Every structure is written in C-alpha cells, then in structure tokens.
Amino acid sequence: MVLSPADKTNVKAAWDKVGGHAGDYGAEALERMFLSFPTTKTYFPHFDLSHGSAQVKGHGKKVGDALGNAVAHMDDLPGALSALSDLHAYKLRVDPVNFKLLSHCLLVTLACHHPGDFTPAVHASLDKFLASVSTVLVSKYR
C-alpha cells in the first residue's frame, strides 16, 4: 500500500504525539489484543499475561520501538523491518492474521489516548501505515 505525502505527514505527526509513551501504548495494545482475541495468547505461553506484567510491558516496548523505527524509515519499510520479518516468519511462525489484530488494537489505543487528534484523515493514514508494516512483516511467509 502506497503512503501519500499527506499520509506520511499524518503518521509522523501522530507518532510525535506518542512521544515517550510508545512502549506503554504497545503494552496496552497487546493487552487489548489478548483480551479481545484470546487465540493470540498461544504465541506467549511463557509470558505472564496479566495486566501490567513486566513481560507484556517489555514486549510492548519492542512493539513501540519497532513502530518508531518504521515511522523513521517509511520510505524503506522492507529494509527497516527485514530482521523483524525474518524473526516472525522463520523462528516465531506467527500467523499473519495476528498483525492485523494487533494493528487494530494499536489504532484503538491511539484513539483512546489522543481523541482530539484522531481525525478521520489521521485514522486512515495510520491504518494504511500499519497495513504497510503488516504487509512487510508477512512478506517472508511466501
């Protein structure tokens, strides 16, 4: 999915507002995903999935950091996310549908924390961006 210049501007502006909360938002999105889509828990049998657990917070930070890297490299998502794509495809073998589920939970989390900034245009841009990230992450599955 091609991001327009307006989409890139919207994504960067939204991510700037996330600021130092990327890890917290990542953890919150993971918690939402585990509660809303319980089958996603199967990839984390060794985690304490309770609210506020250190393991969920730690993985949330990884999610937030990866998205921050993707925002910084929007013009080369395949290059920026290649190692992460390899990890999820070859080692972790995550079902590709889970990226869509997490993307949805991230959108909900961002909308909850920044309701005034979450306009239809920003929502659409973030959705396109997260779909692009998901596409790159599943590209090694073929």
Curated annotation (Swiss-Prot):
Modified residues annotated as N6-succinyllysine in this record: 8, 12, 17, 41
Entry superkingdom: Eukaryota
Description of how the protein assembles with itself and partners: Heterotetramer of two alpha chains and two beta chains.
Keywords: Acetylation, Heme, Iron, Metal-binding, Oxygen transport, Phosphoprotein, Transport
Keyword Nucleus (UniProt): no
Residues modified to Phosphotyrosine: 25
Family assignment from sequence similarity: Belongs to the globin family.
Residues covered by the Globin domain: 2-142
Organism the protein comes from: Antrozous pallidus
Entry binding sites for O2: 59
Protein name per UniProt: Hemoglobin subunit alpha
Purpose of the protein: Involved in oxygen transport from the lung to the various peripheral tissues.
Modified residues (Phosphothreonine): 9, 109, 135
Modified residues (Phosphoserine): 4, 36, 50, 103, 125, 132, 139
GO biological process, one term: hydrogen peroxide catabolic process
Taxonomic path: Eukaryota, Metazoa, Chordata, Craniata, Vertebrata
InterPro entries: Globin, Globin-like_sf, Globin/Proto, Hemoglobin_a-typ, Hemoglobin_oxygen_transport, Hemoglobin_pi
Binding site for heme b: 88
Residues with PTM N6-acetyllysine: 17
Organs and tissues of expression: Red blood cells.
Entry GO terms, CC: blood microparticle; haptoglobin-hemoglobin complex; hemoglobin complex
GO molecular function (one): iron ion binding
Gene: HBA
